[in-house]
């Protein structure tokens, strides 16, 4: 393998050792030096990463602009910070993790010096934590909206506090990277790598550090999100059975479930799919890393392209979020349509009446946008 595969397989390049798993490499240096190369599998990884970078940057910036300046402002006031933070976390992943990974795979070794080694590894772990924790906040918000629909007055303040906590925790949990990573020159050869070699005196320290970040990055978010949506589904099922029992009585229903507004159900479906995409995209990568952790010899057995494909598949998650948001949000699609039609609008005065009619039509659609129908109840 070449490059640094971020987090779970951080330096699996035969640079200092061949058994580094997660963020560390504390084993003795290998006796026979094998110069890392920019392999065909790594070339595919770099090309795929650059494609994902372009799409993720454009789509997440579009979501952020829509929520802050466009029709996305029609979202309920407490939902806007959630969507904006999710897009921001994806942008941090896009502008930190993807370029770093691509360049590092091309150069194979580290050329940016010790300070940049520490900073980039810190930002990399911060980006991955923030992306996971923001999804936890979104799940907690939907959990509260469905199970406590009348408790809406503090929704915005509660979400802001949770988002602030998520960002601060991400910074704190990533801060050890500033101390354990450094630029190391391999003995006897002209080769420098950014690694954690020698930062841990005992193997159990390495294991504890690895396990801790595996739990905070994957296990804890997965457990919280699973618990939230399990309770939500149980509550929806309970309300559906209650509505069936009252089928003979006159009642007002705004969606397929009793007393749950259609806009709230639409937001719930969107967040479930966003969380599912996170789990689907990143699970293979994390499981492979844990497998290497307990069976490091498999690093020599499994083909290089498997690691590269799994990491690229994990990065695909940053592209999925804006696509899912756009599918469920007419206002975002309207903003994109307005952006693409802007040049045509200025090119021909005859197109103005038609364009204005189109905008009125989209505006009517946006009235049923997710969150807009939620605003009277605050959810």
Curated annotation (Swiss-Prot):
SUPFAM superfamilies: Family A G protein-coupled receptor-like (SSF81321). CDD domains: 7tmA_GnRHR_vertebrate. Residues 355-379 are annotated as: Disordered. Glycans are attached at residues 4, 18, 23, 105. Keywords: Cell membrane, Disulfide bond, G-protein coupled receptor, Glycoprotein, Membrane, Phosphoprotein, Receptor, Transducer, Transmembrane, Transmembrane helix. Residues 66-80, 141-167, 231-283, 329-379 are cytoplasmic. It is found in: Cell membrane. It is a multi-pass membrane protein. GO terms for biological process: cellular response to hormone stimulus. Receptor for gonadotropin releasing hormone II (GnRH II). This receptor mediates its action by association with G proteins that activate a phosphatidylinositol-calcium second messenger system. This is Gonadotropin-releasing hormone II receptor. The lineage of its organism: Eukaryota, Metazoa, Chordata, Craniata, Vertebrata.
């Amino acid at each position: 393998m070449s490059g640094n595969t971020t987090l779970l397989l951080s330096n699996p390049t035969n640079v200092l050792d061949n058994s580094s798993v997660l963020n560390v490499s504390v084993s003795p240096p290998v006796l026979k030096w094998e110069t890392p190369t920019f392999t065909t599998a790594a070339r595919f990884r770099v090309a795929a990463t650059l494609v994902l970078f372009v799409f993720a940057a454009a789509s997440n910036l579009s979501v952020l602009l829509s929520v802050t300046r466009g029709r996305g402002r029609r979202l309920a006031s407490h939902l806007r910070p959630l969507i904006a933070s999710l897009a921001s976390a994806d942008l941090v992943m896009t502008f930190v993790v993807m370029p770093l990974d691509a360049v590092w795979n091309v150069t194979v070794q580290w050329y940016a010096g010790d300070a940049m080694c520490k900073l980039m590894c810190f930002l990399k772990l911060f980006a991955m934590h923030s992306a996971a924790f923001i999804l936890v906040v979104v799940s907690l918000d939907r959990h509260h909206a469905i199970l406590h629909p009348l408790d809406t007055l503090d929704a915005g303040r509660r979400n802001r506090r949770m988002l602030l906590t998520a960002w601060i925790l991400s910074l704190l949990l990533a801060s050890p990277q500033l101390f354990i990573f450094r630029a190391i020159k391999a003995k006897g050869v002209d080769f420098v790598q950014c690694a954690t070699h020698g930062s841990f005196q005992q193997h159990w320290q390495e294991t504890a550090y690895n396990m801790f970040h595996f739990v905070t990055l994957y296990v804890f978010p997965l457990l919280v999100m699973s618990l939230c949506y399990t309770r939500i589904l149980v509550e929806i099922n309970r309300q559906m059975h209650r509505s069936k029992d009252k089928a003979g009585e006159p009642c007002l229903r705004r969606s397929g479930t009793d007393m749950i507004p259609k806009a709230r159900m639409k937001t719930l479906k969107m967040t479930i799919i966003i969380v599912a995409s996170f789990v689907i995209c990143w699970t293979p990568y994390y499981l492979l890393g844990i497998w290497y952790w307990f069976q490091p010899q498999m690093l020599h057995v499994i083909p290089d392209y498997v690691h590269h494909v799994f990491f690229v598949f994990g990065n695909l998650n940053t592209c999925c979020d804006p696509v899912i948001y756009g599918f469920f949000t007419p206002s975002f699609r309207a903003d994109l349509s307005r952006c693409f039609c802007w040049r045509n609008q200025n090119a021909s005065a005859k197109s103005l009446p038609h364009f204005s009619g189109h905008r009125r039509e989209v505006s009517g659609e946006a009235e049923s946008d997710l969150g807009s129908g939620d605003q009277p109840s605050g959810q």
